[in-house]
A protein has these predicted regions:
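GST-like domain detector, emphasizing the conserved glutathione-binding G-site
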Residues: 1-110, 116, 123
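Short, conserved alpha-helical segments within structured domains
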Residues: 20, 68-71, 104, 128-137, ...
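Phosphate/oxyanion-binding loops and surfaces in catalytic or ligand/nucleic-acid-binding neighborhoods
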Residues: 57-61, 147, 170
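Alpha-helical scaffold segments in carbohydrate-active enzymes
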Residues: 78, 114, 139, 143, ...
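Surface-exposed helix-capping loop/turn segments at secondary-structure junctions
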Residues: 117-128, 172-177
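GST superfamily/GST-like fold recognition
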Residues: 125-150, 167
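Catalytic and substrate-binding regions of cell-wall glycan-acting enzymes that process beta-1,4-linked
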Residues: 150-158
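Long hydrophobic alpha-helical segments typical of transmembrane helices together
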Residues: 158-180
Length: 180
C-alpha cells in the first residue's frame, strides 16, 4: 500500500513460497518476502524499511510523521514481537503447539484491546490522520479478522473494527488488491 501511496512504480512478482526462485536468493540471501530491488541495485528486504524508503521518496499526507516516530516504532515492534507469533498460530493452529485457535484468539486479546483503546481516542492509532503505524499494522489485523470475521465484527473491539473497515473500504487498498 505504501508503494502505491507514494506512487513508486514497481514490477511485482508473485513468489510461490514453497518454490522460491533462485533470483530471489541472489538478491536477498534471507529468502523472505518482500524484496525490493532499487534501480541503483540496492536491496531492501524488510517491510518497514521498504515503507520508510517509499515515504522518504514521497509522503503527501505525512504518514511518516516525525513527531510520532518513537510511538510508531513502538507499536510496530509490539506487533512484530508479540502479536505476529500469536497471529501465525491463530491462522494455522494445526501447526501450533496448542492446536486450538480459540486459545490463540484469547492470547491476542491484550494486544487487540490496546489498539482498540488507542482508537477510542482518535480516528487512527496515533492521532486523527493516518500514520505509518496504521498502514504497517493493518495487514496483520486484516489477517486476524479473516480467520473469523463474524467473531471479530461482534467482539468488543468496535473502534478497531471501524478502523479496519476504513482501510478495507479505502480506494488505495481496493486499487492495490485489484492489481493482484
Amino acid at each position: 500500500m505504501t508503494l502505491a501511496y507514494s506512487k513508486i512504480k514497481v514490477e511485482p512478482r508473485e513468489v510461490e513460497l514453497k518454490n522460491k526462485p533462485q533470483e530471489m536468493f541472489l538478491a536477498s540471501p534471507k529468502g523472505t518476502v518482500p524484496v525490493l530491488i532499487l534501480e541503483n541495485g540496492r536491496v531492501i528486504d524488510e517491510s518497514i524499511e521498504i515503507m520508510i524508503w517509499a515515504l522518504t521518496q514521497s509522503d503527501p499526507d505525512g504518514w511518516l510523521s516525525v513527531g510520532q516516530k518513537d510511538k510508531c516504532h513502538e507499536l510496530i515492534h509490539l506487533n512484530d514481537i508479540k502479536f505476529k507469533p500469536i497471529l501465525d498460530n491463530y491462522k494455522y493452529p494445526q501447526k501450533s503447539e496448542k492446536k486450538d485457535p480459540l486459545y490463540y484468539r484469547e492470547k491476542a486479546q491484550e494486544y487487540l484491546y490496546k489498539l482498540n483503546s488507542l482508537l477510542m481516542k482518535n480516528h487512527f492509532l496515533l492521532g486523527n490522520h493516518i500514520n505509518m503505524a496504521d498502514v504497517a499494522l493493518f495487514p496483520f489485523i486484516r489477517q486476524f479478522y479473516m480467520v473469523d470475521p463474524q467473531w471479530f465484527a461482534q467482539s468488543g473491539y468496535k473502534y478497531l473494527h471501524a478502523w479496519l473497515q476504513f482501510f478495507l473500504d479505502s480506494e488505495l487498498f481496493l486499487t492495490v488488491m485489484k492489481k493482484r
